[in-house]
Amino acid sequence: MAATSNQEINDLISDLIAAWDRADAKAFARQFQKDGTFTNIFGQTFEGQEEFERRHVDVFTGIFKGTKFELELLKLKYVRPDVALADLETRVLGITKKLPPVFQVPLGAPLRTRLLLVLVRESDTWWIAGYHNVDLKS
């Protein structure tokens, strides 16, 4: 089961990258639970798949328009066979718009964040129950 689950989770991560790179908010939210929780890099919290998708429409048409996304899985921990924590480092590349001052990122440099995904397996599918993202300053 673990090897299968590892591959399925890696596939979910690959799907997130591909959806970001296409600026496809619907696909980016596809495996986000209907009642999932999203905390963005500003510390704002939102509930539900529809809101997660709506927020990413803003992301893909705003300051991160045209960017590319890299995700590096640092650690995958199974809390139970059907619950996993995925600790990732993200990099947003190709930023061409000035970021708010809260980000200490020179124009053109990648934005780095730490992302914790809480994943729940239901009906043979891994779902994102929690998406908690924090800005890395260095």
PLM features: residue spans?
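Helix-to-beta-strand junctions that scaffold the AdoMet/dcAdoMet cofactor pocket
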Residues: 33
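A beta-strand edge to alpha-helix "cap/lid" segment located at domain peripheries
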Residues: 2-27, 37-138
